[in-house]
Amino acid sequence: MSKIASSSNSDPDSRSLQVLLDTFGSRFSLDDIAAAYCQASQNVDVAGEILSAMAEKTPQCDQVEMKTATSKPTQVYVPKEVPRQEDSKAKVWRPKRNSISNGTVSSVIGKEYARTRPISNAPKEATKPLKINSRDIPETEIWSEEMRKSNEGKISRAPTDVEEFIVKMLGEGFQASQEVIHQVLGVCGYDVKKSTEKLLDFSDTKKYADVGISNEVMSKVDPQRQSTSCNQMELQKISQSVGARTFTGSQEGRNAKNGLEKEVLEALFSGAERYVDKPKVTRHFGERRPGVAGRPVFKPLEDPFQERVVAVKQSSNTSKEDDDENEFKAHRKAVREHLNQMKEYYGAAAEAFSKGETERAHRLVEKGHFFGQKAREADDKSVAKMIDVNQEDDSTYEEDEVVTVNMNEHEAKEALRLLKRQLIYFSGISSFKYLRVQLGEKKEDFKSKRKHIVKLLEGESIPWTEEDGGLVIMIRVDEIDPKKLSFAKK
């Protein structure tokens, strides 16, 4: 050190080594500094870079030890950065010498804060914004606490146990197969409560609750009716629910945009309607008016024709129809109430099963089965009542479905010939339901006309009914095959 200090004013190498020693003396020995200086071919800047690189590789524990707590200001020289070839055109700011204190602070945090960073004015390239995936973001403590609270009280069970429990709970009266139950459980993540709600929504009992048609009764009424399997429809509803929401959302946005454009175009190209004043009526005063014959009118004329009041006699079947309708509504109300109670019990059973309360879950399932059976019985009663009403209404008819034939002015043979002609014309036509034969008043030929007509109908095996005490005969012609009539032309 004495040699370097004595010759610092004469030898440039000694001055360079003195600068390096003052800068890196706390990190390296004199031999290391001299070796780096020789390696850099007596270039102070390159030697400073070599020593800086070596200082970054050394462990930080060597920086904690300090020789003295007090410090005196020294001149620190930070070497300039060698510019790269690709940034040769950019302007580089060279650092200046800063007078700082090397004391206890620098021994703890290092001397890197004394080294200034080069600032480049090189143009920056445009880059795309960073895409952040929500799955990569770590969960916060609040999320973890909420998840911990939501998972409290739930016991993880094997998928087979969950599937067996749901099959047992929904087995009686449930139309879906076990494969559908397995797939719905997979979609819902084997959550007992969600799977139960989804399967109850897809069940046939819930589907026909508001319509009043059950599978058992419909199979008795219409044996040719083939019930289509709803398993594929259920799975399509589950898989396409998200896609349907997306499609409807985009369609609504597109319709709103088209409507806005249409309103703008109409406002631009449609002008206001032209206002036209009504012609003023000019009155001429002082002119003579022709004389008016007759008397002046003081009140409006009276209508000599009085309004005819038609009193409609209420049918005797009205009260019976009202009773049937009230009974049908009562059955439908009972079906809805029993189904709601069954669903509540099934939901409570699913929640108890997820918490590990197996015995309580089975008791709730039994109660749900009881109310489900009650709902099916009420459903069957309502459907039976509806079928009885339809069968009674089948005998009724509209006036446009009836063809009336008046036999009052005809003799027995002429009436019989006219009836045969009408039966040939109107038989087998669905738009004409009945043929009304009016025999007229009970005169001398009334019995003979009725005798010939009844004999013809019985001979052709045609059903008929009487009305108004035998004065009217109703024949159901839409069910008659005209080819089977014996008097029809071959």
UniProtKB/Swiss-Prot annotation:
This is Putative nuclear RNA export factor SDE5. The lineage of its organism: Eukaryota, Viridiplantae, Streptophyta, Embryophyta, Tracheophyta. The keyword Translocase does not apply. Involved in sense transgene post-transcriptional gene silencing (S-PTGS). Not involved in repeat-induced transgene silencing (IR-PTGS). Essential component of the trans-acting short interfering RNA (tasiRNA) pathway. Required for the production of tasiRNAs. Acts together with RDR6 in generating double-stranded RNA from specific single-stranded RNAs. May be involved in the transport of RNA molecules that are converted into a double-stranded form by RDR6. Involved in virus-induced silencing. Not involved in the biogenesis of microRNAs and 24 nt siRNAs produced by DCL3. Keywords: Plant defense, RNA-mediated gene silencing. Disulfide bonds: none annotated. It comes from Arabidopsis thaliana. GO terms for biological process: defense response; ta-siRNA processing. One of its GO terms (cellular component) is cytoplasmic ribonucleoprotein granule. Disruption phenotype: Elongated and curled downward leaves. Upon infection, over-accumulation of cucumber mosaic virus (CMV) RNA and enhanced susceptibility to CMV.
